[in-house]
Amino acid sequence: MTIKSIKHKHYDKLVTLGCIICKKMGFPNSHAEIHHINEGRIGKRANFRMCLPLCPSHHRNGIESYHYSPKKFTKKWGTQKQLLTLVNKMLR
């Protein structure tokens, strides 16, 4: 398997899992996009395994979305690393 195929297989698993925030709210079958955790590096994407499945509302569209207000999102749902730990447990 190539790195590219491993990466796409991982992304497929994330999308199939659905939005991690919607799951926490009791809505298990939501559509998900890939959110790359940037680990504080401006303009740099994280390793493909450092990604979260988020629906458009929790990723970039809503007033509680990560990209609208990272601080508000983190206060309500936890850090990206905490969410990543939860996602990784669910993928096992």
Q: What are these model-derived regions, one by one?
A:
Residues 24, 37, 42-43:
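The feature represents the first ordered module of a protein
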Residues 30, 50-51:
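Conserved catalytic motifs of the protein kinase core domain
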Residues 33-39, 55-61:
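Histidine-centered catalytic micro-motifs
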Residues 41-50, 60-92:
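Polybasic, low-complexity binding patches
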Residues 28-31, 38, 69:
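Acidic/histidine-enriched, beta-strand-rich ligand/metal-binding domains
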Residues 4-33, 57:
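Short cysteine-rich loop/turn motifs with clustered Cys
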